[in-house]
Structure formats: structure tokens, C-alpha cells
Regions:
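Terminal low-complexity "docking" segments
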Residues: 1-162, 166-212
């Protein structure tokens, strides 16, 4: 019975987002196909990265409500002050699960919905960060994200690098050298995200954009 309830909630959320988005369906399906191919082609699995710190600022909470029903891996920082300040979660998704497939579509719709001008102007931010293809376990990937987010700079100390934020990621990659990109995306097959123009961007583990 629990699975039926969850599926109904997912379908309801999916319908709500479809009604609320003003965009042609061809654009969505193109984005969906690109991210699906990149995120799942290696092993049929990926991780959805969510920034839960923005939940309190967002007017539509159906995605966070649904995510509470899913297994997740929290990104645990070694710096105590960051534990509650930067709540990041990884949600494992599989192409073999219809339920996961529905969440995958919902996450794309939600990411596009977050790009609406009125939402950005009101400071709601972007909670859907990326779809990550990797051979790492959830715990291993969470540890890697935690270590990469905190960078030590000589004479300055530790700084918070929000590289996982889709509004930051696309600006950061061009200014990093090859070694820095590879370190940041170590053990990542592809890092997929939707940029500020609503375009799906696929980045390989070497930090280079994947050609369409």
C-alpha cells in the first residue's frame, strides 16, 4: 500500500509542475533525453544532488515533501559549523525503478521551474543541483562532495566553495586548469546540470563539456 501512495504523490506532483511551467514540451523532452543518456548510460544509476538549505525560501514544497520518502545520503562535513548550514543530500536513482524514473522527471521539471524570473527575483534559489554518474557508493560520493566543498587557501584558511550550485558550476569550470577540474570531479563519469538559460549541460569527469 505504501508504494501505491508514494506513486500517486509523485504523479500528482508531476501534473502540478507540468501545469505550472510555461515552456514547450519539446524543450523538456530534449533536456530529459540529454540528462537521461548522460546520467544513466554507464551503469543505469545516478545520484540526484539536492541543496536542502533553500527549502525555507521556496514557495512550492512538493519536491522536498516527496524527497522525504526516499533513501538519501547526507553530505557530512568535518567542520561542525557547516553541518546544519549546508544540508546537501544525494538521492540514488535507477533506470530499473519506475518510482525513481518519476522522481527523475520531477527533478528536471522542478529545476526548470526554479529558473522562472519571479522565483529568482524573490531569492528562492536553486535546490536541484545536479545528476551525477559515478561508480562510487553513496557514502563515498557524499564524502567527496564534502571534501571538495571546503577548500584550504594559504593565508586565508578554509573557504566554502559552492561548486555544486548550478549557478556557480558553469562559471567556475572555465577558470580552473585541467588538474583542478580533475580533482574536483574525481571519480565522476558525468556531472549533468541545467544552466541559467534552461539548457542541459553535461560535463565529463575531466571537466570538459560533453558534445551533443
Amino acid at each position: 500500500m505504501g508504494n501505491i501512495i508514494n506513486t500517486n504523490k509523485l504523479q500528482c506532483a508531476f501534473n502540478i509542475i507540468m501545469a505550472g511551467l510555461i515552456m514547450d514540451s519539446e524543450s523538456f523532452y530534449d533536456i530529459n533525453e540529454k540528462i537521461t543518456n548522460a546520467a544513466f548510460e554507464k551503469n543505469g544509476q545516478c545520484f540526484l544532488l539536492i541543496d536542502a538549505s533553500l527549502e525555507q525560501y521556496q514557495s512550492e514544497l512538493f519536491l522536498p515533501d516527496i524527497l522525504r520518502e526516499y533513501k538519501s545520503y547526507p553530505v557530512i562535513f568535518h567542520q561542525r559549523e557547516l553541518q546544519s548550514a549546508v544540508p546537501l543530500y544525494l538521492f540514488p536513482l535507477s533506470t530499473f525503478s519506475e518510482r525513481d524514473g518519476q522522481l527523475f522527471k520531477n527533478s528536471i521539471y522542478h529545476s526548470l521551474n526554479e529558473l522562472k524570473t519571479e522565483k529568482l527575483d524573490s531569492g528562492e534559489g536553486r535546490s536541484v543541483c545536479a545528476w551525477i554518474s559515478t561508480d562510487l557508493t553513496g557514502e563515498q560520493l557524499a564524502e567527496q562532495v564534502a571534501l571538495s566543498t571546503v577548500q584550504s587557501i594559504q593565508s586565508v584558511g578554509d573557504i566554502l566553495l559552492r561548486y555544486y550550485d548550478p549557478s556557480v558550476f558553469g562559471l567556475l569550470m572555465p577558470i580552473l586548469d585541467k588538474w583542478q577540474k580533475q580533482q574536483l570531479l574525481s571519480n565522476v563519469n558525468t556531472w549533468s546540470y541545467i544552466d541559467g538559460d534552461g539548457i542541459a549541460q553535461i560535463v565529463n569527469g575531466d571537466g570538459e563539456c560533453k558534445k551533443n
